[in-house]
Amino acid sequence: MGKKSRVKTQKSGTGATAAVSPKELLNLTSELLQKCSSPTPGPGKEWEEYIQIRSLVEKIRKKQKGLSVVFDGKRDDYFPELIKWATENGASTEGFEIANFEEEGFGLKATREIKAEELFLWVPRKLLMTVESAKNSVLGSLYSQDRILQAMGNITLAFHLLCERANPNSFWLPYIQTLPSEYDTPLYFEEDEVQYLRSTQAIHDVFSQYKNTARQYAYFYKVIQTHPNASKLPLKDSFTYDDYRWAVSSVMTRQNQIPTEDGSRVTLALIPLWDMCNHTNGLITTGYNLEDDRCECVALQDFKAGEQIYIFYGTRSNAEFVIHSGFFFDNNSHDRVKIKLGVSKSDRLYAMKAEVLARAGIPTSSVFALHSIEPPISAQLLAFLRVFCMNEEELKEHLIGEHAIDKIFTLGNSEFPISWDNEVKLWTFLEARASLLLKTYKTTVEDDKSFLETHDLTSHATMAIKLRLGEKEILEKAVKSAAASREYYTKQMADGAPLPKYEESNIALLENTVADSRLPIVLRNLDDVEEQGDLKIDEAMDAEVTENGFVNGENSLFNGTKSESENLIKEESNRETEDAKESSSESTDEVKE
């Protein structure tokens, strides 16, 4: 999926022997766990923390060199066995073959004409690696006792993958042998390659991903060495950081949600063969047939014999593609950047604005998005900005006015402005805010384009620079679009143009008719971000912006990254760190050198 590099392939069996002390590794992983469990540093300190964590990880990797297990041969040597295994177990394998598409890596190539919407690929449940199959495997005993595994299906799948890879008789070995040995996610970037992402929005999630992965590895290293329920896992003698990085990357780039067998809920799964398909723009064409209990995929478009068969991964931004899938997608029609906005509690009209927003189903503080295509904002962001810029009289009209309900319904519709003055204010604000965000970058669009043309860069460095270039291009488009809208509504106000009238309430009017094909997008709910200082209009216009896009100091981070599952691993890690502090020597004594 996406461009995949491969230096060597992973194999079940024993790795090379290295003279490394288990006690020394436990001490290093305990130190890593403690470091990764510290609170998120303030603005400008994240890079320093990243370097410190990376230094510890590299120490561990150096000690573990030669311990990882490998398969013989190349990845594509195992493709015939994958097809044979899939065929024998009820998957469709006719009409396509696995082929190498150079920059995009391996993918599926049509061997006959395939019509749009034709069912061409299906994979039965028994071929899938799922959280349920993990619970029924050798991992089940530890799963039943570990809160992290129970709460985080992606980590469960990663360990399921590692355990099955270490079993030469695993049912899934024909699939596992064909997985890449390395990925192009930022977990595999060199330090100088990550440097290119500094000052971008994406860097915060890159730091978070690296820190979380290191914390999880350190936590589970101790669990595997000391927990009674982990004694039967085939990982005790060889569980390296590189192994864990490979497993979480395999899951991160491939996991999908499918329904459980009874259809009552969803679970995470790895889908062999289907996950060979690369991405293009389009619509989701994969579903799950509960009656036949299989994953099914219909063709996104007509494919001629010899053409690559693409699928659509979803409406992901390029930041999401780079961080979670390891590739940058040119001409991504769903690309976007985040913009954190909130109504300040010190605003004298806060209570009224909060009530209007609540009636519209919009939080008073959230992460919204600026899009790469016109219009740059969703209906939800338009509604928020209108309320954000309302005066007292306009707020009263939306709360107790004669047509209050109608006005709430049309908040997100571009055809029905609140007033010309309100429209001028909101576009002026958006123009200023996007301009502020542009100032946080150390290079310009022209600088990045020139750098890409004149330097011989690694694939990772190219990806990083394209990502920061893309962020700036979206912000520049937003500035131009907002300026054009501001000028238009200023003229409407100067000309005394009448406001458009509406007749009756219609919930459909909440959608922005200019972008009726796009649902409002909120990238993160209020509960998912830390408590933040919100902005008044005048504060946003005049605020200084720091390197990583902070406005008004450390309490105005617009790209907070914290999820419930991350909090859980951190909570568990803190507990383990305390254990490590209190009984480090006792714990290491349990592992004989």
From Swiss-Prot:
Leader sequence residues: none
Subcellular location: Cytoplasm
Domain SET positions: 94-314
Basic and acidic residues bias locations: 563-593
EC number(s) stated in the UniProt entry for this protein: 2.1.1.85
Keyword Transport: no
Region named Disordered: 1-21, 549-593
Gene3D superfamilies, alphabetized: Rubisco LSMT, substrate-binding domain, set domain protein methyltransferase, domain 1
Cellular-component GO terms for this entry: cytoplasm
MF-aspect GO terms: actin binding; histone H3K36 methyltransferase activity; protein-L-histidine N-tele-methyltransferase activity; transcription coactivator activity
Residues noted as binding S-adenosyl-L-methionine in the record, renumbered to the chain: R75, E104, G105, F106, R254, D275, M276, C277, N278, H279, S325, G326, F327
Pfam families hit by this protein: Rubis-subs-bind, SET
Keyword set, alphabetical order: Actin-binding, Cytoplasm, Methyltransferase, S-adenosyl-L-methionine, Transferase
Predominant subcellular localization, coarse grouping: cytoplasm
BP term (GO), one: peptidyl-histidine methylation
UniProt feature, compositional bias: Polar residues: 553-562
CDD domains membership: SET_SETD3
Catalysis: reaction(s): L-histidyl-[protein] + S-adenosyl-L-methionine = N(tele)-methyl-L-histidyl-[protein] + S-adenosyl-L-homocysteine + H(+)
PANTHER family, per database record: ACTIN-HISTIDINE N-METHYLTRANSFERASE, UNCHARACTERIZED PUTATIVE METHYLTRANSFERASE
Function in brief: Protein-histidine N-methyltransferase that specifically mediates 3-methylhistidine (tele-methylhistidine) methylation of actin at 'His-73'. Does not have protein-lysine N-methyltransferase activity and probably only catalyzes histidine methylation of actin.
UniProt free text on domains: The SET domain specifically recognizes and binds actin, suggesting that it does not accommodate substrates diverging from actin.
Protein name stated in the entry: Actin-histidine N-methyltransferase
Record gene name: SETD3
